[in-house]
């Protein structure tokens, strides 16, 4: 029989600060699972392809920064304990993606986006606001966000050079995990967002992808 842990508001604030540092500081996010890229050979790519892949992986890394902040914000304001636990568990799984993307970016001779703190703060606020409205809306936001992430992953998989098996292995596993997160959120009672809301979310996502591809 497992014992549910109860945290005071100060405890939760300290946990949020710890998670923020683990998300934003270089090399601080330690994955729970080894990177799928480990077993893949390093490809010989042109400088142009290497820069392009680094840009794609930088976008994906920032996407995971946003996911971390979103889940943490929702966990802070979630009303039901089981929803809070689901948000915290999803955030732990996203740590893997965060670390895998950063590892790959470094292997490609590049760096994460300097805009990550900005996007973390914005996403944390959105997540906390969604949690304040209702757990149903909060879970629905997770599902809609993960759907958007999967679309980006599919686009990036199509753009990867055929020989880059390392990046491909990472993105394919990320897609599997994100699809599972979306399904779990809906099964837990998440609200299915209408198309206009999803369209607005896609416009915001474009701002992130365009800005973080290079910086």
UniProtKB/Swiss-Prot annotation:
Its cofactor is Fe cation. Catalyzes the hydroxylation of 2-nonaprenyl-3-methyl-6-methoxy-1,4-benzoquinol during ubiquinone biosynthesis. It is a peripheral membrane protein. Signal peptide: none annotated. Fe cation 2 binds at residues 94, 146, 178, 181. It comes from Pseudomonas fluorescens (strain ATCC BAA-477 / NRRL B-23932 / Pf-5). This is 3-demethoxyubiquinol 3-hydroxylase. It is an enzyme of class 1 (oxidoreductase).
């Amino acid at each position: 029989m497992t014992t549910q842990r109860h945290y005071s508001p100060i405890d939760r604030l300290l946990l949020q600060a710890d998670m923020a540092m683990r998300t934003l500081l270089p090399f601080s996010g330690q994955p729970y699972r080894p990177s799928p890229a480990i077993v893949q050979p390093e490809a010989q790519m042109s400088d142009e392809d290497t820069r392009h892949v680094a840009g794609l992986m930088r976008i994906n890394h920032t996407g995971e920064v946003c996911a971390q902040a979103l889940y943490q914000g929702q966990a802070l304001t979630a009303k039901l304990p089981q929803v809070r636990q689901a948000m915290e568990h999803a955030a732990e799984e996203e740590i893997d993606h965060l670390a895998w993307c950063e590892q790959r970016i470094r292997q490609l001779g590049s760096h994460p986006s300097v805009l990550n703190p900005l996007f973390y703060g914005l996403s944390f606020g959105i997540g906390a606001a969604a949690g304040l409205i209702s757990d149903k809306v909060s879970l629905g936001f997770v599902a809609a966000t993960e759907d958007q992430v999967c679309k980006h992953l599919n686009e990036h998989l199509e753009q990867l050079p055929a020989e880059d098996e390392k990046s491909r292995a990472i993105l394919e596993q990320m897609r599997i995990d994100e699809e599972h997160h979306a399904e779990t959120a809906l099964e837990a009672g998440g609200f299915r967002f209408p198309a206009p809301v999803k369209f607005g979310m896609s416009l915001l996502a474009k701002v992130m992808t365009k800005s973080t591809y290079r910086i």
